């Protein structure tokens, strides 16, 4: 080939590059190949002592993920497309050791992009070491004790305000009843709680408020009990002997049902009865019948909160499962949505960037109390509680705070 012909071809090549370069530049960089799915993982107590609550969380997670996937998935800017979510879900059998092992498996074998929490303070306290150790972003809606968030963890986020705040809210409401002339001062309190960090934090919250206002409150008995209580007689004999005006307890659904059934059989009565966040659950009310009337609950959510978001979720949950929504379902649903939103905000599946997006979460129009999700520096939300009271005929009234109240509290409980 002659030099002139070779030069001619080189010149043609350069001309073509010059012609198409602007077009290629206009198209921007080519997005990397997207994964087929965003893989989220969780381990829930689907059998064992916490099986009922674990099943509630399963339904909430699955409803949120179906809704996201029906809309095409999560938009991830790095790949310039929506990617559907795949949820890997294991049964931890309500066992702490199994829960830790399963979260290790989700990270090391299943190679999840992010993690959703289980249910119950003991389980969550145990298994959160795995996401922190491997630096995998994690959000839970089933663990409220401050102990979980006091360990300087950077990858752990929680959707439930603290149990200490729950106890303080309950005591503030009782003070309001005193100011309204419905409750005497000082009022004598019997407080019991499960022998876990959950129950200890509840009892401490009651004691702290008592020490701060001795003119209002006097604790006459402060007693722990073992989780999964089989016989409440000994515990309630102590409560009976204390001659308290108010009975406050912190218990899981099964223990609440056991304790209050025996409470009723013994003919006990107090001006106010509360089992902390328990009392309004349909399963418990069905089991206890009219004995559950007038119990006061301090909780993280209610379908009766007067917001569009709460109403919309209650309706979609009822349609999906043909049963009423409770806080377990709502918080699980919102937990999954918060994780999806963090991935979308990060615009990538990079775990550090998703973690950073979670830390900066400011999600408006949420169904949580107050309508906003954000996390404090320790990773825990700090929104308000809503207080409810069981009313005769299976009805429920929101009683506190005034911004959401639908009825006045019945205090004292009517004598039967």
Indicate where each model-derived feature is located.
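Signal peptide-proximal N-terminal region
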Residues: 33, 38, 59-86, 211-217
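Extracytoplasmic ligand/sensor domains, especially the bilobed periplasmic-binding protein
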Residues: 112-222, 271-296, 304
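Short, low-complexity disordered leader/linker segments with a strong preference
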Residues: 1-39, 70, 414-416
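Extracellular/periplasmic periplasmic-binding protein-like sensory domains
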Residues: 263-333, 344, 399-416
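Sec-exported extracytoplasmic/periplasmic mature domains
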Residues: 62-73, 104-112, 128-136, 175-179, ...
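Beta-alpha junction/loop-to-helix N-cap segments that form part of ligand/metal-binding clefts
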Residues: 29-31, 52-57, 74-150, 159, ...
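Extracytoplasmic "Venus flytrap"
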Residues: 41-62, 90-97, 119-120, 192-201, ...
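Segments of small-molecule ligand-sensing domains
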Residues: 319-326, 340-399
């Amino acid at each position: 080939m002659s030099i002139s012909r070779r030069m001619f071809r080189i010149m043609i090549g350069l001309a073509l590059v010059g012609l198409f370069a602007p077009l290629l530049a206009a198209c921007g960089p080519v997005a990397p190949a997207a994964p087929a799915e965003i893989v989220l993982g969780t381990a829930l107590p689907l059998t064992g002592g916490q099986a009922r609550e674990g099943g509630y969380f399963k339904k909430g997670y699955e409803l949120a993920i179906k809704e996201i996937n029906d809309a095409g998935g999560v938009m991830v800017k790095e790949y310039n497309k929506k990617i559907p979510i795949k949820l890997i879900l294991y049964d931890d059998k309500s066992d702490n050791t199994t829960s830790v092992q399963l979260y290790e498996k989700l990270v090391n074998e299943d190679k999840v992009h992010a993690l959703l929490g289980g249910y119950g303070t003991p389980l969550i306290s145990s298994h959160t070491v795995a996401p922190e150790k491997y630096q995998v972003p994690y959000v839970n809606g089933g663990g409220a004790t401050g102990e979980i968030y006091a360990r300087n963890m950077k990858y752990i986020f929680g959707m439930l305000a603290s149990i200490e705040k729950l106890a303080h809210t309950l005591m503030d409401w009782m003070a309001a009843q005193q100011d309204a002339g419905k409750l005497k001062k000082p009022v004598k309190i019997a407080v019991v709680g499960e022998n876990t960090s959950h129950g200890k934090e509840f009892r401490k919250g009651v004691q702290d408020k008592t020490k701060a206002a001795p003119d209002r409150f006097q604790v006459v008995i402060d007693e722990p009990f073992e989780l999964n209580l089989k016989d409440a007689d000994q515990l309630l004999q102590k409560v009976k002997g204390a001659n308290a005006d108010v009975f406050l307890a912190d218990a899981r659904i099964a223990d609440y049902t056991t304790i209050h059934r025996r409470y009723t059989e013994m003919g006990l009565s107090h001006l106010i009865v509360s089992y902390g966040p328990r009392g309004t659950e349909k399963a418990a009310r069905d089991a206890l019948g009219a004995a559950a009337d007038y119990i006061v609950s301090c909780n993280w959510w209610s379908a009766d909160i007067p917001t569009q978001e709460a109403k919309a979720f209650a309706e979609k949950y009822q349609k999906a499962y043909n049963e009423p929504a409770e806080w377990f379902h709502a918080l699980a649903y919102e937990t999954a949505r918060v994780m999806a939103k963090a991935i979308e905000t990060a615009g990538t599946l990079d775990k550090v960037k998703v973690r950073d997006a979670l830390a900066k979460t400011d999600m408006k129009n949420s169904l949580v109390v107050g309508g906003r999700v954000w996390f404090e520096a320790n990773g825990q939300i700090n929104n308000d509680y809503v207080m409810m009271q069981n009313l005769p005929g299976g009805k429920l009234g929101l009683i506190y705070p005034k911004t959401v109240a639908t009825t006045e509290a019945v205090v004292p409980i009517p004598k039967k």
